[in-house]
A protein has these predicted regions:
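Extracytoplasmic cell-surface/polysaccharide-interacting catalytic and binding patches
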Residues: 1-69, 81-194
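Segments that shape or occlude catalytic/ligand-binding pockets
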Residues: 72
Length: 194
């Protein structure tokens, strides 16, 4: 594993960016807070890409809302314990792109302050969360397309098919896994990953 000198704090770089870290509260697949600290970190190589996406969103009168970025390996182990399905959660032995600092989870807020309906919530691990699932109503499909265009419009991020909210750098998996940057709450049965 590599050190974490490649990570930057999004709250410092983008002070107006809305950050709602879902794993720092109970609003996630585990039903409990995982992160002991609400730190939103991302690999320095993704900062230019995110800046482009923020600008594209603003042109549309929208705002990005960040749900997750860098994720400690210990947190990944807890997510795997809650949902051991490789279609939705990467086994900690493989290593998540979040644990490389190269992936980000997010949604959109409109000019009236409303989160756009995406047809399925964050961390809903079922087919309706897939990027273009036919059961998602047309209005929510359009919102997903809008999010996808904002994130991929600068040619800097790519999405994945199983989660409408997840975007990552191209070749994200080629980056090294990073040492845990902050602590997580330990749940029974979760082993610390070094």
């Amino acid at each position: 594993m590599s050190d974490t000198t490649e990570l930057v704090d999004l709250a410092v770089i983008f002070p107006d960016l809305e950050i709602e870290l879902k794993y720092a509260c109970a609003d996630n697949i585990t039903g409990k807070a995982i992160y002991q600290q609400a730190r939103c970190l991302l690999h320095k190589d993704a900062i230019t890409a995110l800046a482009k996406s923020i600008s594209i969103a603003q042109l549309s009168g929208l705002q990005l809302v960040i749900y997750d970025a860098y994720r400690p390996q210990q947190a990944q182990a807890m997510l795997w314990q809650a949902c051991p399905d490789p279609q939705y959660v990467v086994d900690v032995t493989v290593g998540s792109n979040h644990s490389r600092g190269t992936a980000i989870d997010l949604t959109l807020r409109d000019e009236h302050g409303n989160i756009l309906d995406m047809g399925a919530g964050f961390d809903e691990m079922h087919e309706r969360s897939h990027a273009y699932h036919p059961s998602v109503p047309p209005a929510a499909q359009r919102n997903r397309l809008l999010l996808n265009a904002i994130m991929t419009g600068g040619g800097c991020f790519v999405g994945i098919s199983s989660e409408w909210w997840h975007f990552e750098l191209p070749q994200a998996a080629s980056y090294p896994l990073l040492a845990d940057q902050f602590s997580c709450f330990i749940s029974p049965g979760t082993q610390h990953v070094s």
